[in-house]
């Protein structure tokens, strides 16, 4: 048996997230059906994470085992023939039999994009959060400095998050602005459900002047989801890279 590692890009707009589920079409389901058509056998993908409905990925990593002896390029060009335009396999590689995409990941890089302008942009609506009022990016960056380190992120998760522990390590949070776009890059060891989106929503509330930058430090010491910011829309979030 071979273990094949795939790097996948997708626009999550029309999907109910990565993971196969009873209600709604998932990215994983579409990929597994394409591989079934290519290989003539059903495979089960194991991924480096589970993006939520509407969240995008530039480099989701997933693996599967197969007895087929196809060349690696066939897993790219061949499978892509059976995939819709909003999902593509970028590369395929042989992996060790014990490779585990989520457990072996050293860090993940997420990017949250904000379109900060008075008037909405139809061309950016699927890949950014439109915030009308001007944001103070200097205040947002001051707030972001509190995130790196190992902290209790209970205030920055979904109410239905079932993680056994809310301790997570964040390596860096940076904010860059270019014209009307504000980009929040978050790199960390692992994330709770909706964690990056709540972080982004809280930083936007700092930028709006609703919170002082020190609110982030307070929330990490006093984890209360109700005292954090809104959950930013899924459309602005993208998984950029997974490091091993």
Curated annotation (Swiss-Prot):
Task performed by this protein: Formation of pseudouridine at positions 38, 39 and 40 in the anticodon stem and loop of transfer RNAs.
Name of one Pfam family that matches: PseudoU_synth_1
Residues forming the catalytic site: 52
GO biological process: tRNA pseudouridine synthesis
Species annotation: Pelobacter propionicus (strain DSM 2379 / NBRC 103807 / OttBd1)
HAMAP family cross-referenced by the UniProt entry: TruA
NCBIfam families attached to this UniProt entry: hisT_truA
Reaction(s) the record says it catalyses: uridine(38/39/40) in tRNA = pseudouridine(38/39/40) in tRNA
Protein name: tRNA pseudouridine synthase A
Gene3D superfamilies listed in its UniProt record: Pseudouridine synthase I, catalytic domain, C-terminal subdomain, Pseudouridine synthase I, catalytic domain, N-terminal subdomain
Record note on quaternary structure: Homodimer.
Coiled coil spans: none
Record keywords, A-Z: Isomerase, tRNA processing
Enzyme Commission number, as recorded: 5.4.99.12
Keyword presence, Cell division: no
Primary enzyme class: isomerase
